[in-house]
From Swiss-Prot:
Major localization class: cytoplasm
Keywords linked to the UniProt accession: Cytoplasm, Disulfide bond, Electron transport, Redox-active center, Transport
Active site positions, chain numbering: 32 (nucleophile), 35 (nucleophile)
Name of the featured protein: Thioredoxin
UniProt similarity note: Belongs to the thioredoxin family.
All residue ranges annotated as the Thioredoxin domain in the record: 2-106
Family matches, as InterPro entries: Thioredoxin, Thioredoxin-like_sf, Thioredoxin_CS, Thioredoxin_domain
Task of the protein: Participates in various redox reactions through the reversible oxidation of its active center dithiol to a disulfide and catalyzes dithiol-disulfide exchange reactions.
Annotated compartments: Cytoplasm
Species the sequence originates in: Geodia cydonium
Site (Deprotonates C-terminal active site Cys) location in chain: 26
Disulfide bonds: 32-35
Site entry: Contributes to redox potential value: 33-34
Amino acid sequence: MVNFLKTKADFDQALKDAGDKLVVIDFTASWCGPCQRIAPKYVEMAKEFPDVIFYKVDVDENDETAEAEKIQAMPTFKFYKSGKALSDYVQGANEAGLREKIKKNK
């Protein structure tokens, strides 16, 4: 299961709690077609990579986090380690690209 981070405080706490594990966050929106298409694949990846932590942020419900992370398009998948954003990210419903970046950064 992939949980939603509903507030900026939830986001900050999730990164802190993850320690040095890779965290992947799907910045998504309920009205975004490509977001809905990749959502089941994202859940599959959470099962495929049990050593990686997966979350979602709805950009409309948690706009404070979306703004702080400079999200311009959905879906955007950002990667974090030790509480810091990595330079890698994936924009768009690119399953192969997302899987590749997870393997590279975990």
